[in-house]
């Protein structure tokens, strides 16, 4: 539907990259992405669509954890900065139209939620109930770790505009916990 000469669709949105770390099968694990798999997916779409169709380029959306936490290294301020810049350069140097999700340009990270009560996403609650309470296949502690890594709530926290109260997002208490790093990432 997207070949340039067909004049049907002008761009392809493909989500294969969003499952590179096993998210399509089971996002509630410690599984990390394979750099080899990541490069193969990106290359396949770049080569396959070259002079054939136009691609959309993105690392994040409202249903994905923050890309710098997912594909980068946030273990130190220096690693965080270099990872965020590397991901931005990678995205912008490919053929296609880059889409930047709110906060990605700042290098916003996943939120260190500590409790089930910190979450708002229904998928997260349902998965917790299924895996921890019904199946008893995952411990409470492991599930909290998986949720910190993969919950959609990571992408749904308020934009970190500045280092003022509530990151300058609102004078009122936000609907979900602010990432405590808003003091330095804004």
Question: Which role does the model predict for each range below?
Answer:
Residues 1-186:
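Active-site and adjacent substrate-binding regions of carbohydrate-active enzymes
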């Amino acid at each position: 539907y997207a070949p340039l000469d067909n004049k049907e669709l002008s761009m392809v949105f493909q989500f294969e990259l969003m499952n590179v770390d096993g998210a399509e099968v089971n996002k509630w694990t410690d599984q990390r992405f394979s750099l080899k798999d990541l490069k193969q997916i990106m290359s396949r779409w770049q080569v396959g669509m070259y002079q054939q169709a136009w691609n959309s380029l993105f690392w994040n959306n409202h249903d994905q954890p923050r890309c710098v936490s997912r594909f980068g290294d946030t273990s130190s301020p220096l690693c965080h900065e270099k990872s965020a810049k590397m991901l931005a350069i990678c995205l912008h140097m490919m053929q296609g139209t880059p889409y930047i999700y709110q906060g990605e340009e700042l290098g916003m990270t996943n939120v260190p939620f500590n409790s089930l009560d910190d979450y708002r996403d229904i998928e997260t609650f349902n998965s917790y109930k299924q895996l921890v309470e019904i199946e008893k296949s995952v411990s409470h502690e492991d599930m909290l770790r998986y949720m910190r890594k993969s919950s959609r709530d990571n992408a749904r926290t308020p934009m970190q505009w500045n280092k003022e109260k509530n990151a300058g997002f609102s004078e009122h208490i936000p609907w979900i916990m602010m990432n405590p790093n808003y003091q330095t990432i804004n």
